[in-house]
Curated annotation (Swiss-Prot):
One of its GO terms (cellular component) is cytosol. Acetyl-CoA binds at V140, Q141, L142, R148, K149, G150, L151, G152, K153, N179. It catalyses: N-terminal L-seryl-[histone H4] + acetyl-CoA = N-terminal N(alpha)-acetyl-L-seryl-[histone H4] + CoA + H(+); N-terminal L-seryl-[histone H2A] + acetyl-CoA = N-terminal N(alpha)-acetyl-L-seryl-[histone H2A] + CoA + H(+). Residues 63-216 form the N-acetyltransferase domain. Its EC number is 2.3.1.257. GO terms for molecular function: histone H2A acetyltransferase activity; histone H4 acetyltransferase activity; protein N-terminal-serine acetyltransferase activity. Disruption phenotype: Liver-specific knockout male mice have decreased body mass and are protected from age-associated hepatic steatosis. Male mice show a reduction in the liver triglyceride and free fatty acid levels. No effect on liver cholesterol level, liver weight, and liver function is observed. The keyword Transferase applies. It comes from Mus musculus. Keywords: Acyltransferase, Cytoplasm, Lipoprotein, Myristate, Nucleus, Transferase. This is N-alpha-acetyltransferase 40. Belongs to the acetyltransferase family. NAA40 subfamily.
Amino acid sequence: MGRKSSKAKEKKQKRLEERAAMDAVCAKVDAANRLGDPLEAFPVFKKYDRNGLNVSIECKRVSGLEPATVDWAFDLTKTNMQTMYEQSEWGWKDREKREEMTDDRAWYLIAWENSSIPVAFSHFRFDVECGDEVLYCYEVQLESKVRRKGLGKFLIQILQLMANSTQMKKVMLTVFKHNHGAYQFFREALQFEIDDSSPSMSGCCGEDCSYEILSRRTKFGDSQHSHTGGHCGGCCH
């Protein structure tokens, strides 16, 4: 009986430790989501004036955006990505994409030309993935006239900066394998790695999946992926 009782206590203690670890993860995500402007502490990153561009950058929750700006972001995403989605197992659905982009948890970086014309954006969230606190990048979309001028890379660097400042463990994103330009951009130019949770690594569907999950660790990320009792895709509410 003593051995059985000891094992039960060990299991209970392990559950308590896992719960405490997940509570700590969720506390960091909640703290990040309570910020008024995650970019406020980094004013130098609110301007991009290189390679012929001169844009201002702001960070807002989706609830703080004008409806016209949300419509622009959706239309740009559809223009840039609908064909890519239709070539995947996901397909393109206007309603589902709009719901994703207007979710209460959504944050946006918006790049403005002349302070009034939106030319690029990133949709991201502070969330929990596989037990880790992360900044998940859902979209980085640019108008054609501002591409290949370093702005997309600059927006991702801002995400990495904010992930570090909020003590997230990594920046994550999903990219289609057949979107060769984007895949090469993230893997080579930005040094993202295939995440342990990606289908090709986890073995859930491997080569049959049309996408990879990529990630880049912050200074708070462990050298190896660790599961702390959370589940992939989870959030703290």
